[in-house]
Curated annotation (Swiss-Prot):
GO molecular function, one term: DNA-binding transcription factor activity
Keyword Nucleus set for record: yes
Tissue specificity as recorded in UniProt: Expressed in archespores, pollen mother cell, ovule primordia and megaspore mother cells.
A single BP term in Gene Ontology: negative regulation of leaf senescence
Gene encoding the protein: TCP9
Name of the featured protein: Transcription factor TCP9
Localization of this protein: Nucleus
Bias-annotated ranges (Low complexity): 308-322
Presence of the UniProt keyword Nuclease in the record: no
Annotated organism of origin: Arabidopsis thaliana (Mouse-ear cress)
GO cellular component terms, semicolon-separated: nucleus
Alphabetic keyword roster: DNA-binding, Nucleus, Transcription, Transcription regulation
Length: 356
């Protein structure tokens, strides 16, 4: 339902104002009420004035340009702690002016240095007047001049202990003496190559081999694995070198390592030169006397009976006979050992082929 309210102002005596309500019900406009009402002449129809809000004047204070107060510089003495430190000395203005003028004439950096110079030069007169002088307890005489140390004894002891901790061994200087020999061994293999001195009792073959080997290299015996145990690899055996007990490390890293080809060639040449000529025996009717001689001392002599038609034995020397006998027996034993290994290998191969 829509309601239409219509106000009509009627001019007349009573100045009545009628309100007409027009109601539309189902599309029909009807006038329901029409009632007059009195208008109060004292009431003004003018718009009411808006209330004025009180104005508050808020003025922001400008930021203060002055920050926190600066820390005042300390006027205390910053030198060695002595009796009387930090105390001001009051003197007449004429004395202060004379000291200031003397500082400029002497070229000192401060007035305190000038006062110290005055005390040092006036020390004889002070001693004559007082009997003791103005020498403090911590002052020292260096080349006839009194010196006051700027560091305490505790600081100097700490510095000395620190230097001692840094040093690995006793030293009388800050530098390392290259020519100084190290008394204790480090336990590591040396880098530089060293030469060994063979004693005169060493064998001739080992001497020749050591002389022909490259410097810094040592011979090694490679022993192959047994044919019966194929899983075990070959291992190397380093021969015992005769010499004094203070020899350097056996295995040394050469500074300039030689090539393997030169090492193999040197070993082959050494073995060729160390092998003596074969023994030549001429049959005779008597017996052959073979002696084992080491150097010039006769150790033992063995007699072997052998049928022969001539009376003579042709040998180079007794030492060559001993060496030849040793090599002959060694070659013979090695040959037997090789035959045994070959026989075992052949039997193993035959057994495997028969099983398959």
């Amino acid at each position: 339902m829509a309601t239409i309210q219509k106000l009509e102002e009627v001019a007349g005596k009573d100045q009545t104002l009628r309100a007409v309500d027009l109601t539309i019900i189902n599309g029909v406009r009807n006038v329901e009420t029409s009632r007059p009402f009195q208008v109060n002449p004292t009431v003004s129809l003018e718009p009411k004035a808006e209330p004025v809000m009180p104005s508050f004047s808020m003025s922001l204070a400008p930021p203060s340009s002055t920050g926190p107060p600066l820390k005042r510089a300390s006027t205390k003495d910053r030198h060695t702690k002595v009796e009387g430190r930090g105390r001001r000395i009051r003197m007449p203005a004429t004395c202060a002016a004379r000291i200031f003028q003397l500082t400029r004439e002497l070229g000192h950096k401060s007035d305190g240095e000038t006062i110290r110079w005055l005390l040092e030069n006036a020390e004889p007169a002070i001693i004559a007047a007082t009997g003791t002088g103005t020498v403090p307890a911590i002052a020292m005489s260096v080349n006839g001049t009194l010196k006051i140390p700027t560091t305490t004894n505790a600081d100097s002891d700490m510095g000395e202990n620190l230097m001692k901790k840094k040093r690995k061994r006793p030293s009388n200087s800050e530098y390392i003496d290259i020519s100084d020999a190290v008394s204790a061994s480090s336990g590591l293999a040396p880098i530089a190559t060293t030469t060994t001195i063979q004693p005169p009792q060493a064998l001739a073959s080992s001497t020749v081999a050591q002389q022909l080997l490259p410097q810094g290299m040592y011979p090694m015996w490679a022993i192959p694995s047994n044919a019966m145990i194929p899983t075990v690899g070959a291992f190397f055996l380093i021969p015992q070198i005769a010499g004094p007990s203070n020899q350097p490390q056996l295995l040394a890293f050469p500074a300039a390592a030689a090539s393997p080809s030169s090492y193999v060639a040197a070993v082959q040449q050494a073995s060729t030169m160390a092998r003596p000529p074969p023994l030549q025996v001429v049959p005779s009717s008597g017996f052959v006397s073979v002696s084992d001689v080491s150097g010039s001392n006769l150790s033992r002599a063995t007699s072997v009976m052998a049928p022969s038609s001539s009376s003579g034995v042709t040998t180079g020397s007794s030492s060559s006979i001993a060496t030849t006998t040793t090599h002959t027996l060694r070659d013979f034993s090695l040959e037997i050992y090789e035959k045994q290994e070959l026989h075992q290998f052949m039997s193993t191969t035959t057994a495997r082929s028969s099983n398959h």
